[in-house]
């Protein structure tokens, strides 16, 4: 029986699809501007970023498509919007670097994971270059080979 890999205690959610679809060139850490009910829902583990992406407007970065499912008990006086646009908190130089790469070099900016840092929610974003179909196949083939190699070593030790 295979063991389930445990996610780190401070990790909220991860975008596994992004590492399959893109070559990640560089990563950045960004804060998220959240409302109170969103923080409460994130603590309950109700956040997903698999369909999320990042866009730039007026020298600011925004996270689109991140889904935070509201809790029934926490948002009684507010009408929650589960897929609203959330502002990413980055330094001006980081925003300029990301914006320049996305506009000129054909890169994409994707969210990789969200995690707790002290009591703040942080989002790890990556400057990514899209993979072609043959690159994806090669990645899967290499991963399978590494897995088979490890199995072979374990059988030899037993």
Curated annotation (Swiss-Prot):
Keywords: Cytoplasm, RNA-binding. One of its GO terms (biological process) is trans-translation. Residues 135-158 are annotated as: Disordered. The keyword Kinase does not apply. It is found in: Cytoplasm. One of its GO terms (molecular function) is RNA binding. HAMAP family: SmpB. This is SsrA-binding protein. The gene is smpB.
């Amino acid at each position: 029986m295979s063991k389930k890999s445990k996610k780190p205690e401070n990790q909220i959610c991860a975008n596994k699809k992004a590492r399959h679809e893109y070559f990640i060139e560089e990563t950045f850490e960004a804060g998220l501007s959240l409302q109170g009910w969103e923080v409460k829902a994130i603590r309950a583990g109700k956040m997903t970023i698999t369909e999320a992406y990042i866009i730039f407007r007026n020298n600011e970065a925004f996270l689109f498509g991140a889904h935070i499912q509201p809790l029934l008990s926490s948002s009684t006086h507010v009408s929650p919007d589960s897929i609203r646009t959330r502002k990413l908190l980055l330094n001006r130089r980081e925003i300029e670097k990301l914006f320049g790469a996305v506009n000129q070099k054909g890169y994409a900016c994707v969210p990789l994971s969200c995690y707790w840092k002290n009591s703040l929610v942080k989002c790890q974003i990556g400057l990514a270059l899209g993979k072609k179909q043959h690159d994806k196949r090669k990645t899967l083939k290499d991963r399978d080979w590494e897995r088979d190699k490890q199995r072979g070593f374990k059988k030899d030790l037993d």
